[in-house]
């Protein structure tokens, strides 16, 4: 699959071939794209939708043009004991992340968001992957397409966790591998993608 956009727990892939399995395949329109309205309609009855096109990049671009682009960064913070830093945000397990600020480098954003959301100072080790997340933002009455750049980061020590409660975070914890696996069952698919990228690299 060329690109996958997540709508909370549901996914839309833009691909050249129908993937089969649990994916519900739909053909791109004659213009090469597909409207956001049609995608949302398909997602009402299917968890995974594949938009099949001879030019998946064009189909994705047509969809993306109907959304406001947002850049963000976050990461998997690993301490000296091999534990991961996870947060519990709005009822789901998550990883620290947030929007890119004006004039900020994307790696700087990842480290800043980690510190703001958890109180942990960490340094970027390497890039991991990117995820795409589409959502409706009521304050501006618009759809946004958030591209999050994910990194592995390292932090020394295990203390000093301060969850940013104003961002809906009720806890920040260091998790051993078994705890990470358990928590990922109650995380959004984008977070599971990041965990998989950690395992591949």
Q: How would you label these PLM feature ranges?
A:
Residues 33-74:
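Acidic, metal-coordinating catalytic segment for phosphate/diphosphate chemistry
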Residues 74, 83, 171:
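Conserved beta-strand and immediately adjacent loop positions that scaffold enzyme active sites
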Residues 5-7, 16-24, 28, 159-201:
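Nudix hydrolase/Nudix homology domain
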Residues 2, 72, 146-150:
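Short hydrophobic/aromatic beta-strand or adjacent loop that forms the aromatic wall/cage
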Residues 7, 79, 88, 137-138:
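Acidic surface patches and DE-rich sequence motifs
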């Amino acid at each position: 699959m060329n690109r996958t956009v997540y709508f909370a727990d549901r996914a839309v892939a833009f691909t050249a071939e129908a993937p089969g399995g649990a994916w519900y395949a739909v053909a791109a329109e004659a213009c090469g794209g597909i409207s956001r309205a049609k995608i949302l309609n398909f997602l009402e009855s299917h968890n995974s939708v594949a938009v099949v096109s001879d030019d998946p990049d064009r189909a994705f671009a047509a969809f993306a043009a109907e959304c406001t682009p947002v850049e963000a960064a976050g990461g998997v913070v690993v301490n000296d004991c091999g534990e991961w830093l996870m947060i519990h945000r709005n009822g789901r397990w998550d990883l620290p992340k947030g929007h890119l600020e004006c004039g900020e480098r994307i790696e700087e954003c990842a480290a800043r968001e980690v510190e703001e959301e958890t109180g942990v100072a960490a340094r970027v080790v390497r890039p991991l992957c990117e995820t795409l997340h589409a959502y409706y933002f009521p304050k501006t009455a618009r759809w946004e397409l958030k591209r999050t750049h994910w990194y592995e980061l390292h932090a020394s020590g295990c203390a000093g966790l301060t969850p940013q409660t104003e961002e809906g975070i009720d806890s920040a914890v260091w998790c051993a591998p078994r705890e990470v696996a358990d928590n990922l069952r109650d995380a959004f698919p984008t977070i599971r993608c990041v965990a998989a990228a950690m395992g591949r690299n």
